[in-house]
């Protein structure tokens, strides 16, 4: 039976989830997780406490409880459960009070207030990424914060969407296709925005696996074609001095982080 994990908050529970996932990912185990947001009343807290206690009685193991609860009276109810408590907010508050010389003034949902302020920017960035995906149009490249380049199936679209959704970055992407290989060069719209260009590449063998799973027994998915495309595109990156990263065996989160690190782009939101 998988160890039970609770992510609890009097807000969205995003903070508890992020920290909890980061900690638990250090262990080669699987967990049965339940997220419970908006535990804003003592009645709700008592109901959650009952869930935790029932889980302990059923499994004989104390559930792991990751929480970020601002209200002390609600937090105390969760503390009194049979769960093993990991309280992220208050673990850091007391030491910081000493360092800053200021008493904390907790405010519910303050941690996500910036999300409300930047909601429109996030939506604009997502819409931009979708409208400028895979070279659908070259008309709005001047408005991009970032333009990703690469062969088909190297990770351009998921990276663009992740950057827009997570950080509010307007990320366009442009594909280099088989037809481009004989005379590979940057289109004029990309030349005008060369300072925004960032390349993605991938190991040919991995590219072959990805394409083969979608279009087997085609020239497009052949290992030879994958090798040709990757080689030509990497040569273009070097010729044009375009920074690039290899996406092989990296998650979209890791790819996005590498892009931000290399480009110095500012995260528009957290």
From Swiss-Prot:
GO MF, any single term: phosphotransferase activity, phosphate group as acceptor
Catalytic activity from the UniProt record: [pyruvate, water dikinase] + ADP = [pyruvate, water dikinase]-phosphate + AMP + H(+); [pyruvate, water dikinase]-phosphate + phosphate + H(+) = [pyruvate, water dikinase] + diphosphate
UniProt-listed Pfam families: Kinase-PPPase
Enzyme Commission number(s) of this protein: 2.7.11.33, 2.7.4.28
InterPro entries tied to this protein: Kinase-pyrophosphorylase, PSRP
Keywords: Kinase, Nucleotide-binding, Serine/threonine-protein kinase, Transferase
Binding positions (ADP): 150-157
Record-stated family: Belongs to the pyruvate, phosphate/water dikinase regulatory protein family. PSRP subfamily.
NCBIfam families cross-referenced by the UniProt entry: PRK05339.1 (NF003742)
Purpose: Bifunctional serine/threonine kinase and phosphorylase involved in the regulation of the phosphoenolpyruvate synthase (PEPS) by catalyzing its phosphorylation/dephosphorylation.
Name this polypeptide is given: Putative phosphoenolpyruvate synthase regulatory protein
